[in-house]
Curated annotation (Swiss-Prot):
Record keywords: Cytoplasm, Ribonucleoprotein, Ribosomal protein
Protein name according to UniProt: Small ribosomal subunit protein eS25A
UniProt GO molecular function: structural constituent of ribosome
Keyword Repeat: no
Stretches that traverse the bilayer: none
Length: 89
């Protein structure tokens, strides 16, 4: 009989040190980089911009109101946006 396999320790993820308030540099990065993303959602902004979820939702809402990005689909919790095509912008 084979020896009993030991349980792995599992992966330990470090606590995220994401920004919790907007400052000028974050706003500038969002306005410059996010409209170029093909797929835009709260989780994408949290991952790439290193901001927390509430800031990501505020940023997406602001970009959508200004017409920089457009909504593709809305799930019960997750909204998916994309960049505005160049022909309509």
């Amino acid at each position: 009989m084979a020896p009993k396999k030991k349980w792995s320790k599992g992966k330990v993820k470090d606590k995220a040190q994401h920004a919790t308030v907007f400052d000028k540099s974050i706003i500038d990065r969002i306005n410059k980089e996010v409209p170029a993303f093909k797929f835009i959602s709260v989780s994408v902004l949290v991952d790439r911009m290193k901001i927390n979820g509430s800031l990501a939702r505020i940023a997406i809402r602001d970009l959508a109101e200004r017409g920089v990005i457009q909504k593709v689909d809305q799930h019960s919790k997750q909204a998916i946006y994309t960049r505005v095509p160049a022909a309509t912008a």
